[in-house]
């Protein structure tokens, strides 16, 4: 799993740093954006193995951004995991139905979070 590039699209700097530090400690390379629009450009340019997408971003929301990624030939095969602090607003079933490949609630259960990442990266490499 190590050395895979993961794009983190999260507008909260503390959350972004926490996720980045966790992933880098596990050997992943990370790329970060605090806005969906910039994240879409980075995804197209760098083709990460996985995108972690906050749902409630300022500006374009995470659901709209994910749908644009899935609609683009350049990024449609990159798995996108929804990450949200709002378990009441967005549930796993509705986020997967929207088109996300995975779903995690912040704060993360570390073992579930890493297992989901491993599953999605394996899926993207096959």
Give residue ranges: language-model regions.
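Active-site beta3 strand of CheY-like receiver
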Residues: 46-52, 57
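Conserved acidic carboxylate
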Residues: 10
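Short hydrophobic/Thr-rich beta-strand motif most characteristic of the beta2 strand and flanking loop
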Residues: 27-34, 42
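Short amphipathic alpha-helix used as the core "switch/output" element in two-component signaling
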Residues: 41, 63-76
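The feature encodes the CheY-like receiver
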Residues: 58-61, 76, 88
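Charged docking surfaces used in two-component/phosphorelay signaling
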Residues: 17-25
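Acidic catalytic/metal-coordinating carboxylates
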Residues: 14, 35-38, 61-67
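The short loop immediately C-terminal to the conserved phospho-acceptor aspartate in CheY-like receiver
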Residues: 56-58, 81, 86
